[in-house]
Amino acid sequence: MSDPAGNRPKTEKELKKEAEKAAKLAKFEEKQKKLAEKKAAASDKPVKEAKAKKEQTVEAAEPVDQTPTGQRKKIDGEIPAAYFPGYVESGWYSWWEKEGFFKPEYIDKLNPGSNPADSFTVCIPPPNVTGNLHVGHALATTVEDTITRFNRMHGKRTLFNPGCDHAGIATQVVVEKRLKRERGLTRHDLGRDRFNQEVWHWKNEKGDVIYDQFRKLGASVDWDRAVFTMDPKMCRAVTEAFIRMHESGTIYRSNRLVNWSCALRSAISDIEVDKKELTGSTLIAVPGYDKKIEFGVLNSFAYKIQGSDEEIVVSTTRIETMLGDSGVAVHPDDQRYKHLVGKQCIHPFIPTRNLPIFADSFVEMEFGTGAVKITPAHDHNDYEVGIRQNLPFHNCITDDGLISQGCGEFSGMKRFDARTAVIEALKEKGLYRGKEDNPMVVPTCSRSKDVIEPILKPQWYVKCAHMAEKAVAAVANGDLQIIPEFHKATWNRWLESSRDWCISRQLWWGHRIPAYYISFADGREQPLPEENYWVSARTEQEALAKAAQKFQVPEAEILLKWDEDVLDTWFSSGMWPFAVFGWPDATKDMDLFFPGAVLETGHDILFFWVARMVFMAQELTGKLPFKEILLHAMIRDAHGRKMSKSLGNVIDPLDVIRGISLNDLQAQLLGGNLDEKEIAVAKEGQARDYPDGIPECGVDALRFALLSYTSQGRDINLDVLRVHGYRKFCNKLWQVVRFALARISDKPEQKPTFEINLKSATPTDLWILSRLAKAVKETNEALKAYNFTQATTVTYNFWLYDFCDVYVETIKPVLYGDNTTLRQVAISVLHKCIDTGLRLISPLMPFISEELWQRMPRLDDSDYTSPSIIVAQYPLTQKYEKYQNEKLEAAFEFAQELIGKVRSLRADYDLKKTKITMQILSETPEDESMLNDISAVITTLTFSEKVSILNKCESDKIEKGSAHIACGGRCQVYINLTGIIDVPKEIEKLGAKLQKNQISVKKIGDIQSSADYEQKVPVDIRALDQEKKATLEKEIENITAAIAQLKALN
C-alpha cells in the first residue's frame, strides 16, 4: 500500500527508522527553538510561551473535558501541552449531533431555497447485528464519511443514512450458540415466538453497541433516519416487493437443488459457502461426528450390467450418493462403452431400481474411467443431465443429514457413516475397485462449518435474466459507474451467466415469506404441480380472497398455511437504497434522496448485494439505486493473512482508537464462540503480533491510516504500527498550531489579517502560499476522484514537509526579529496555512481539525462565520490560484536538495551542534539571483552562521579547509571545517567505520556465493540480503569520499 510519502509498501524496519527520524527531527526543532529564544529580546517573549516552556519540563497530564453532553466544547483555556486523542475526541460529536450539522436540512438553513439537484446521498451498508464492528467496517465507514463530509463542506444537501441488517442466518446461528452455551437450550426448546424474542433482545443489545461504534468513528450520519431491516416500514416494503414480483411472475416457486446445511437445516446463499481446496486425501472435522471424515479421494466401484456378465466402473468423491443414482453417462464418442448405451445397470443395494446407461457430451472421457454416475437430486451438474435425459430424481439424504428411507440397509444412517458402510458393503459384493487421491473443492457452511449438501427442495426463486441484462447495460452505457473500472469485467462475467436467485431460507429469524399454501377443506385431490397452490398476500384475509378467486370456490372451502420460511437477507438488503426512504410510498425523502449518489462497499459482495440492489431498484422503481459503485479492497493483517477470530488477528477499531493491553486483548477471546483449541491458537497469534498490546492511536489517526491504504484494487495489509505513526502526525499538527497560537496576539504586528500584504512577503512566505494553493487543488481533485491515498499523501506532505519542516523553521528568526512588517506578514501566512490546512483535512480527520480550528482566532471574512469546521466552506481551488508560483517552487525544490546534501555532510562529520559558514558558487547569473532570494531558508535549515552566494568568477574567494559538495551541476557548495573538526581523528574514526562495513559486505558476499544459497534461502530473505549489501556498499562509497576530502584539507 502506498504511504503519504510514496507508493511502495514500508517494511517494519523502515517504519522504525521513520519513527527514529521523527524523534531526531523533534529534538532538532526544539534546539532550534531554544537557540532562537535566547537571541530574542526578553521583553518580546510572550507570557504564554514562557509558561508552555515551563510545562514541557514535566510530563503533561491528560486534561479532562467536562463539557455537558450536547454543548459546544469548552476550550477557552490554554491549549494543552501535548496531543491526547481521548481529550480531543470528547465533546465534539454530541455537539455536532445536537446542532443538526449531520442533517440534510441544515444546508437549507444556510442556503434557503437550495436546489434538490445539489443533494448528495450515501446509504451506509448496514452491518449485521451479529457482533461489534470490525476494522473492515471502519474502513467502509471512514471512506463513506469522508465523501459525505467533503460534499457537505462544498455546500451540498448531504444525507449519510445509517442502519443495521438483521442478518438472518448469521444472527440466528450466533443466538443459538449462546443459548446452548449459557442455558443448554435449543431454539426448538423455546419455540419460534420465544426464540425470536431472544433474537430481538440480542439485536437491541448489539445494535446499540454498533451505533456507538459508528459515533466513535465520527460517522456524520442522520440518526433520526436510522433504519433496521426488520423495522415496520422495512417489513411493509419487503412484503409489498414480494407480492408485486410474485404477481408479475418475477418470483416463482420451483423444485431445484440448493446449498443445504444439514446442521442448520436450511438453504444458504452462495456467499455463505466457504470452499476448501484439497490437493488429495484430507481429514476434515464435520459437526456431529466424533472422528474426522476423509475427503479428497476418488472412489471407484462397479455396476453390473443387467442380463450380462459385463460391468461398468464409475468413480465418485461422494460414494454415499450412489444410493441416489438414476443412471450412468458416457461420452457419445467413447468407443469403450458404445455397445453398452441403452442397457441397464443393476443397483447393488436397491433391487427395484435399474440405472440406464446413456450418452451425453458433458462427460469427460479422460477423467476417471470415462463413465459417470448420475445423481440428479444431489449434484448441480447431474441435475442438468437429469432434466435433459428425463431421469427420475431420488433424494437419498434428509434435511438433517441422514440417509433417506428406501435406501435399503443404509436408511437412517448419518450420511458420512453411510460413506464408510457403503464402501464395506461394496467390498463384500466384490464391486469396490479402490481409491486414489483427487484434488477437489469441498463446500462448507461459513456459519456452521458443516459440509454442504446439494439437496432438491421446493423453494422461492427470482428470475434474474432480464434484470441482469439491464444491469449489464447500465454499466455499458455509462449510467452506472464502477470504480475501480477493472471490476467491470467481474460484473459482466457474473451477470451474463447469472442463475435464478433462491430467496427462501428455512429459518425463524427474518422476514417471513408473505405466501400461503392452499388446500381444500374437503380433502380433494390436488393434481397440479405444487407451485400452483400458492398465493402471496399482505394478510391472511387477502390470501383467502385471492385463493377463492383463483380456484373459483367459496372462501369457506379454502384452507391456508402460511409459509414458515423466511426470505434471504439479501432480498431485504437489496431494497435498502429506496426502502429506507419510505417506498412504496411517494415520500419527500424518496424525492430528495433517491437515487443515491454513490454506494461504497467491499468488492467481495459486488454480486451478492450490489447487483441485487440494482436488480430490485430497477424492477420496483424503474431507476438505478445510485450513480456510482465505489469498491474497496479486503483488509488483511500485517502479514497479509485473512482476518479470522480463530487466528486472533481480527482488529476491533475501538482497540486501536483507545489502546488495549495484551491481557485485555486475550480476555476478549473468552467472550466469543471459539473452542479451547482455537482460543489457544488465537492467543499465540496475539502475543506474537502485539507483545505490548495495541497502543492508543485515536480515531483521526485510524481514519487517516485507513484512507492512506486505499490504493485502488489492492488488498490492505493493516499494520497497527503504521496507524500509530499517524498519531505522531496528529501530534505534529497539535504542536505546530500550539506554536502559532503562542505567537498570535492582538498586537498589530502579531495579529493576522485575511488579506496578506504580498508586496512585503518574503520568498518563503510566497513559496508556502504557492504550496498551499497546490495542496488545495490536488486534494480537491483527489477527493472528487475518490483517490483517498492521494488525498492523504498531499495533505500529509503539505503539513509535515512543506509547512512544519520548511516554512515554520524558516520564519522563526522573523517571528523573533525586530522587523514588525515581516512578522505581521508571517503571522498572517501562518494563520492562512493553518486555517486552510485544517479545512483540507477536516473530512479525513474531523476531531483534531475541529479542536484546532476552534482554537484559532477568527478573521473578518465569510470563511470564518461557520459555527463548526464541518459546515465551513471547503477550500476552493479558484480562491487560491493567485498564490501559485511555479518558478519559486522550483527554486525551493533546488534549495531542499542542497539543504539535504549539507545535512548529510554535517552528519558525516558529526557537526550536530556546530554552526557553520558556507559558500555557494553558482554557475549562472539566474541561479545566483535565485540563491540570493532563498539564502535565508538555506541559512536557517542548514544551521549556518553565514551563507555567501558567489558567482563562478569568484572561485578565488573560496576559503581553504572547506569540504566540497556538488549540487546538480548548478552550483558548488563549500563548508569551512577549519577549526571545527580534528582532521586526523575524523580520518581514524571514518577508517574504522569503513573497515567494519567492508567486513560486513564480505560476510554477506560469502553467504551469497555458497553453493546451496539459491536453493535453500527463501526469496524474501535473499532480497533482504541484497538490499543490506547495497546499503553498506553505498555507505562505503560515501565514507571513502569523506576520507578523501579530509585528507585534502591537510
UniProtKB/Swiss-Prot annotation:
Class of enzymatic activity (EC top level): ligase
Listed GO biological process terms: determination of adult lifespan; valyl-tRNA aminoacylation
GO cellular component, one term: cytosol
Span of the annotated motif 'HIGH' region: 127-137
Record keywords: Aminoacyl-tRNA synthetase, ATP-binding, Ligase, Nucleotide-binding, Protein biosynthesis
Motif 'KMSKS' region, chain ranges: 642-646
One Pfam short name: Anticodon_1
Disulfide-linked positions: none
CDD domains: Anticodon_Ia_Val (cd07962), ValRS_core (cd00817)
PROSITE patterns named in the record: AA_TRNA_LIGASE_I
Region ranges (Disordered): 37-72
Annotated Basic and acidic residues bias: 37-57
Protein family per UniProt: Belongs to the class-I aminoacyl-tRNA synthetase family.
Protein name, entry field: Valine--tRNA ligase
The organism of origin for this protein: Caenorhabditis elegans
Lineage: Eukaryota, Metazoa, Ecdysozoa, Nematoda, Chromadorea
